[in-house]
Each structure stands twice: as structure tokens, then as C-alpha cells.
Amino acid sequence: MAVQRTFSIIKPDAVAKNVIGEITTRFEKAGLRVVASKLKQLSKAEAEGFYAEHSARGFFGDLVAFMISGPVVVQVLEGENAIALNRELMGATNPKEAAAGTIRADFADSIDANAVHGSDSEAAAAREISYFFAATEVTAR
């Protein structure tokens, strides 16, 4: 398997709980490397643009409101099979269905406040990384 890059957001609920380091440590212990990272307060326009694919869905307004409710950490992770590995580490979207020991099982409160986001495909990863990072901000390790 080739080295991949994936995109991660540590969401406002997890940032508020002060577990940024614990979540990042899980990525690193699993073999992923952080190659870009920013602590950022999303604007409404940024959140709407990032989640535009969900704009027609009933939860869109609540999702945007949640994502601008506090700072987030946006990261680019790199490693073997990074996309699938990150999704495995995150666990199911609904923390009640997430396997024990996953990030969402340990840190998420609900399906809405579910601690983290991760790219679900190579195309999504490329799009999401470029939404928040210029190529010069991503540094191979």
C-alpha cells in the first residue's frame, strides 16, 4: 500500500474538552504523521463551503452552527493507508455505535458532537486538504 494523505478535523466539542493532544497521539501511535496542522475558528462561510455537499439536507444548519461554535484543529495526516486507518481510529459516526477504544467512543458526546472528521476517499482528502492548506503549508516528514 502506498503512502497516502488524509484530512482530519478535531471538532469544537473535542477542542473544548482539551483532548487535542490525546487525539493527535492516537494518530501518531497508529503510524500516522502530522504534516500540517492549524488551530482555527471557522467562519460561517468556511463551514458552509466545506460542508456544501450537505447543503440540501435537514441537518446542514445545525452542522454549520456546531462547526463555528468554537475553534477546531485542521490537520493533514500522512502514512500507509492513511484514509482507512484514520477512519478506523475515529470509529462509527454515531459514538453509541463506535467500537470501544476508538476516538468517538472515548471523546464524542453525540452523533452531532462526534469529536472528529476524516476524509472518506482519496478524492475527498485532496479536496479537503486544499480547502484549508496551501501546498507550501504541508511538509513531508
Curated annotation (Swiss-Prot):
Its EC number is 2.7.4.6. GO terms for biological process: CTP biosynthetic process; GTP biosynthetic process; UTP biosynthetic process. InterPro entries: NDK-like_dom, NDK-like_dom_sf, Nucleoside_diP_kinase, Nucleoside_diP_kinase_AS. One of its GO terms (molecular function) is metal ion binding. Keywords: ATP-binding, Cytoplasm, Kinase, Magnesium, Metal-binding, Nucleotide metabolism, Nucleotide-binding, Phosphoprotein, Transferase. ATP binds at K11, F59, R87, T93, R104, N114. The keyword Ribonucleoprotein does not apply. The active site is at H117 (pros-phosphohistidine intermediate). It catalyses: a 2'-deoxyribonucleoside 5'-diphosphate + ATP = a 2'-deoxyribonucleoside 5'-triphosphate + ADP; a ribonucleoside 5'-diphosphate + ATP = a ribonucleoside 5'-triphosphate + ADP. One of its GO terms (cellular component) is cytoplasm. Its cofactor is Mg(2+). It is found in: Cytoplasm. PROSITE patterns: NDPK, NDPK_LIKE. It comes from the Bacteria. Major role in the synthesis of nucleoside triphosphates other than ATP. The ATP gamma phosphate is transferred to the NDP beta phosphate via a ping-pong mechanism, using a phosphorylated active-site intermediate. Belongs to the NDK family. Homotetramer. This is Nucleoside diphosphate kinase. It comes from Pseudomonas syringae pv. tomato (strain ATCC BAA-871 / DC3000). The gene is ndk.
